């Protein structure tokens, strides 16, 4: 917007009016283009106010914005919200007469002008300092009056000017600027969520697969009680959230058999996503898992282990779901009177009825809200939403807003493998996190482009980097050997503050149902899959310890707990990728170097952008590998060799940056001006 002074391209700003995203304790960088006519100096102030229970609720704080050294028109600042809720910020531009005067008189003195020629300049400066002294404390007022007196004294011009240029006076004026032609910007919103919306590690497991085997070696159906026992291992690996696929009754009509066959055996358990039977629907638990009370006991055990339970919200129904019997209007009824089942040609899902949200929207909205609120009231605060991009956007916007009115702590993860317009559209209307195409990004070029993009979109979307899912076993894992599992885990755990693992990954499960498919052989979606995690660990056939170490490193390094700041460094081998993250609040800096080749040792010369690390040109510094504990002396140019059978990655922790070198690292890196 342009008033007396120009204020353009304020960021973060979501163009359709939705709030930007942030979490408690996160740096929120704010930038703006401020400009004016002529040569007079211009400055900007960031005004921030928070919700009622924040530290800045009663009176907004004002933060002086600083220009980017190589782009004087861009002003920068940041704030750190301390409570969840809706925060408001505004950028004001103002003419800075003091800076204009300082620049002018300094230039004239350097040009050799004397006392007589500078009479008006000194008098103007004295008057500015007298104006600036108004409303200050007695001590500060006296300091500025002394400067004015010095400017009016005769004698050497440099000596007269010197008191006006001291660090203490400069700092005092920065805290209490003399502002003219103040132009107020637009109030913009930031939706601040609890920290788990950004910093989180997820582990997915099927509760029904936690029952082990009977004496004959036959899998036993798990319960909420056996799941509670399984949580101890999950917590030991350092995960924050354990996610369960649907725990509801499973339809018996058109039930799928093993490996998605249409001819199930009597003992086949079906797909958990075919929700609903005579035993209940979305507000019931599968009878073989246990009762609602048993589920509450599981929640209590999870809390004891500092784990959060995420439930699957899949808005679809099996043919024998109560909705299909009592609310046929929720679905699409065909000409022959049957209800349409789900299709994604040529695939057919005869065991699932998709909901038609245009048939009876008010009742559907009311029923889904009732179901979600039922689980929230039991203590569930996170939902992984199945295929939200196949449901209307306005429904999700309404539902998330309605739940947040009473329970703002609830997190919604969008399982939306879809086009950017849909993925980012869902994020803008309220989803806290989103699945991504990380699984399919395998080359150095693809990974660099992907990580740069997710950092750039941090105001809108928070990516959850799952290394695998029950639906996705990427070819790189099928054929890359054990080293590839470690490589992908290291990348996911360090590229985003949110990452996830589906059970079995730590056992290097890699067999596909057929060549060219990404479906697991003997998929857990259709059968019980108990696993001998303890035996695998004893045999050395497990990635558990490595995953636990990654989560430990993430917790210990704030740089890995933020999304916005990632910088790639040059490595002269297309199989070696190097990138860094810096936390501007603590000065914590982490440099990650990964060998993308799971079969061969790779060497590279890594050339660091020292400025991106907050370091001076020519700096030498010690780095500590958080994986091995080894220490090295590094500089701008460094040799790296990584062997898959030993170490697939370095995660180097650099010396803590001093406060004086941190601030600029929090600023937005804007390469193009957005009009």
UniProtKB/Swiss-Prot annotation:
Enzyme Commission code: 2.4.99.16
Superkingdom, taxonomy of origin: Bacteria
Sequence positions that bind alpha-maltose 1-phosphate: 256, 316, 351, 387, 525-526
Active site positions: 386, 415
Catalytic activity of the protein: alpha-maltose 1-phosphate + [(1->4)-alpha-D-glucosyl](n) = [(1->4)-alpha-D-glucosyl](n+2) + phosphate
Record's keyword terms, sorted: Carbohydrate metabolism, Glycosyltransferase, Transferase
Disulfide cysteine pairs (residue numbers): none
Ribosomal protein is among the record's keywords: no
One term of GO molecular function: hydrolase activity, hydrolyzing O-glycosyl compounds
Signal peptide: none
Gene3D superfamilies reported for this sequence: Glycosidases, Golgi alpha-mannosidase II, Immunoglobulins, Phosphotransferase system, lactose/cellobiose-type IIA subunit
Biological-process GO terms, alphabetical: alpha-glucan biosynthetic process
Annotated site (Transition state stabilizer): 471
InterPro entries: GlgE (IPR026585), GLGE_C (IPR049171), GlgE_dom_N/S (IPR021828), Glyco_hydro_13_cat_dom (IPR006047), Glyco_hydro_b (IPR013780), Glycoside_hydrolase_SF (IPR017853), Ig-like_fold (IPR013783)
Chain's role: Maltosyltransferase that uses maltose 1-phosphate (M1P) as the sugar donor to elongate linear or branched alpha-(1->4)-glucans. Is involved in a branched alpha-glucan biosynthetic pathway from trehalose, together with TreS, Mak and GlgB.
Subunit structure comment from the entry: Homodimer.
PANTHER family to which the protein is assigned, alphabetical: ALPHA-1,4-GLUCAN:MALTOSE-1-PHOSPHATE MALTOSYLTRANSFERASE, GLYCOSYL HYDROLASE FAMILY 13 CATALYTIC DOMAIN-CONTAINING PROTEIN
Family: Belongs to the glycosyl hydrolase 13 family. GlgE subfamily.
Stated name of the protein: Alpha-1,4-glucan:maltose-1-phosphate maltosyltransferase
Organism: Corynebacterium glutamicum (strain ATCC 13032 / DSM 20300 / JCM 1318 / BCRC 11384 / CCUG 27702 / LMG 3730 / NBRC 12168 / NCIMB 10025 / NRRL B-2784 / 534)
């Amino acid at each position: 917007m342009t008033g007396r002074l120009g204020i353009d391209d304020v960021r973060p700003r979501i163009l359709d009016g939705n709030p930007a995203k942030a979490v408690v304790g996160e740096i929120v960088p704010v930038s703006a283009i401020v400009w004016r006519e002529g040569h007079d100096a211009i400055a900007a102030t960031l005004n921030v106010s928070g919700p009622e229970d924040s530290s800045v609720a009663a009176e907004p704080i004002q933060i002086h914005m600083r220009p980017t050294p190589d782009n004087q028109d861009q002003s920068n600042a940041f704030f750190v919200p301390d409570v969840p809720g809706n925060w408001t910020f505004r950028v004001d531009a103002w003419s800075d007469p003091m800076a204009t005067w300082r620049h002018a008189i300094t230039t004239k003195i350097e040009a050799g002008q004397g006392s007589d020629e500078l009479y008006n300049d000194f008098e103007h400066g004295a008057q500015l300092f007298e104006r600036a002294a108004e409303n200050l404390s007695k001590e500060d007022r006296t300091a500025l009056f002394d400067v004015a007196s010095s400017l009016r004294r005769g004698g050497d011009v440099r000596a007269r000017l010197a008191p006006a240029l001291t660090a203490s006076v400069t700092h005092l004026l920065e805290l209490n600027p003399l502002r003219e032609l103040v132009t107020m910007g637009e109030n913009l919103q930031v939706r601040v969520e609890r920290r788990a919306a950004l910093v989180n590690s997820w582990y997915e497991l099927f509760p029904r697969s936690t029952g082990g085997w009977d004496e004959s070696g036959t899998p036993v159906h798990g319960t909420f009680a056996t799941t509670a026992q399984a949580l101890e291992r999950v917590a030991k690996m350092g995960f924050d959230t354990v996610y369960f696929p649907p725990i509801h009754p499973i339809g018996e009509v058109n039930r799928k058999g093993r490996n998605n066959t249409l001819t199930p055996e009597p003992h086949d358990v079906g797909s958990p996503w075919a929700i609903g039977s005579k035993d209940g629907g979305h507000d019931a638990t599968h009878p073989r898992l246990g009762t609602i009370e048993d589920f509450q006991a599981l929640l209590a055990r999870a809390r004891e282990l500092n784990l959060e339970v995420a439930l699957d919200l899949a808005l679809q129904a099996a043919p024998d779901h109560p909705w299909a019997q009592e609310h046929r209007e929720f679905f699409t009824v065909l000409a022959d009177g049957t209800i349409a089942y789900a299709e994604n040609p040529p695939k057919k899902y005869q065991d699932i009825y998709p909901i038609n949200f245009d048939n009876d929207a008010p009742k559907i909205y009311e029923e889904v809200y009732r179901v979600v609120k039922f689980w929230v009231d039991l203590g569930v605060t996170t939902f992984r939403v199945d295929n939200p991009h196949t449901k209307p956007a306005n429904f999700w916007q309404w539902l998330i807003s309605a739940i947040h009115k009473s329970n703002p702590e609830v997190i919604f993860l969008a399982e939306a493998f879809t086009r950017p317009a849909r993925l980012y559209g869902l994020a803008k209307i309220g989803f806290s996190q989103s699945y991504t195409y990380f699984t399919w990004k395998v080359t150095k070029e693809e990974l660099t482009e992907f990580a740069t993009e997710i950092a750039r979109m941090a105001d809108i979307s928070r990516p959850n980097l799952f290394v695998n899912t029950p639906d996705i076993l990427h070819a790189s894992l099928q054929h890359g050997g054990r080293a590839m599992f470690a490589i992908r885990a290291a990348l996911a755990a360090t590229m985003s503050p949110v990452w996830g693992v589906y059970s079995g990954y730590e056992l290097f499960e890699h067999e596909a149902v057929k060549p060219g498919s990404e479906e697991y052989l003997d998929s857990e979606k259709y059968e019980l899959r108990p696993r001998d995690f303890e035996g695998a660990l004893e045999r050395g056939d497990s990635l558990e310890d490595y995953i636990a170490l990654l989560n430990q490193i993430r917790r210990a390094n704030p740089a890995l707990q933020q999304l916005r700041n990632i910088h790639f460094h040059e490595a002269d081998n297309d199989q070696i990728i190097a990138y860094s993250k810096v936390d501007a609040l603590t000065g914590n800096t982490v440099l990650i170097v990964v060998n993308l080749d799971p079969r061969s040792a790779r060497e590279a010369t890594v050339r660091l952008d020292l400025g991106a690390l907050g370091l001076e040109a020519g700096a030498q510094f010690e780095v500590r590998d958080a994986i091995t504990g080894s220490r090295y002396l590094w500089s701008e140019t460094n040799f790296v060799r990584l062997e898959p059978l030993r170490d697939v990655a370095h995660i180097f922790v650099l010396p803590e940056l001093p406060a004086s070198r941190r601030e600029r690292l929090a600023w937005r890196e804007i390469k193009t001006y957005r009009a």
